Amino acid sequence: MAIHADTHDDLRLFQTGEHACGYWSDRRARDLVLDPHDPRLGAIYPQALAWGFRRSGDLVYRPHCERCRACVPVRIAVDAFHPDRSQRRCLTRNQDLVVRVVAAERTDEQLALYRQYLKYRHPGGGMDEHGATEFDQFLIGGWSHGRFLEIREPAIAHLPGRLLAVAVTDVTEHALSAIYTFYAPEAAARSLGTFAILQQIQWAQRERRAHVYLGYWIEGHAKMNYKRRFSALEAYDGRHWCDLPAHPSGT
């Protein structure tokens, strides 16, 4: 893939060549990527989040498409967040589950759940063939500030309950960033994706972190509508973070 260098103060940015858009099949995309070889990348990362960037593996990127600005960085201001009725029902429905934060170190149980989820959500697309190497490269990386938020069924006879979901979460001094969540397909009725974000918000509140970053929201994209359901949502316009009113029709 062709790469063209640019600079921002003393921080190098790279612009990728065009590639297939991961959200719209009829569009082409390109990204800005922070220099992956910069030894300061881990230290720069918290500020990069505030600039609208996101992590995937060891890469910190932001969409920078020539003819499209649909991807909008969004985050939740956790002190101002209040769950709506649907989110309160989600919390009640899942109050039997056990939630804990663990180190970002792959286990066989997590890998098995990840592969099960990919076969369910991305059949035949290549991702469903991911193994341990791809898991580590995509979710953990070499320098990230990651933790895994595990969601389990209740323990039985002092044994851990079945693993239902994992929310890969980056931790910085002032924020959490929701990287990727995967869950047991047969538990989809529990709305575990929404439940995981609610748990990340509570986690941030407990530790007095200001924001939970949710990546990108795309208006009119069905898979992104759920993000508009969260109150205290802020959007980045390229210069400033601005309030984005919750949209009750989002799912």
UniProtKB/Swiss-Prot annotation:
The question of whether Acyltransferase is a record keyword is answered with yes
Q: Taxonomically, which superkingdom?
A: Bacteria
Q: What is its EC number?
A: 2.3.2.29
Describe the reaction catalysed, as an equation: N-terminal L-glutamyl-[protein] + L-leucyl-tRNA(Leu) = N-terminal L-leucyl-L-glutamyl-[protein] + tRNA(Leu) + H(+); N-terminal L-aspartyl-[protein] + L-leucyl-tRNA(Leu) = N-terminal L-leucyl-L-aspartyl-[protein] + tRNA(Leu) + H(+)
Q: Where is the protein situated, by its record's location annotation?
A: Cytoplasm
> Its Gene Ontology biological processes?
ubiquitin-dependent protein catabolic process via the N-end rule pathway
Q: Sorted alphabetically, which SUPFAM superfamilies does this protein's record hold? A: Acyl-CoA N-acyltransferases (Nat)
Q: Which residues form a coiled coil?
A: none
Q: Which GO terms describe its molecular function?
A: arginyl-tRNA--protein transferase activity; leucyl-tRNA--protein transferase activity
Q: What is its main location?
A: cytoplasm
Under the heading InterPro entries, the entry gives:
Acyl_CoA_acyltransferase, Asp_Glu_LeuTrfase, N-end_Aminoacyl_Trfase, N-end_Aminoacyl_Trfase_C, N-end_Aminoacyl_Trfase_N
Q: Can the keyword Nucleotide-binding be found in this entry's annotation? A: no
What is any one of the record's Gene Ontology cellular component terms? cytoplasm
Q: Which family does it belong to?
A: Belongs to the R-transferase family. Bpt subfamily.
Function according to Swiss-Prot or TrEMBL? Functions in the N-end rule pathway of protein degradation where it conjugates Leu from its aminoacyl-tRNA to the N-termini of proteins containing an N-terminal aspartate or glutamate.
Q: Which HAMAP family match?
A: Bpt
Q: What is this protein called?
A: Aspartate/glutamate leucyltransferase
Which organism is this entry from? Xanthomonas oryzae pv. oryzae (strain KACC10331 / KXO85)
Report which gene this protein is encoded by. Answer: bpt
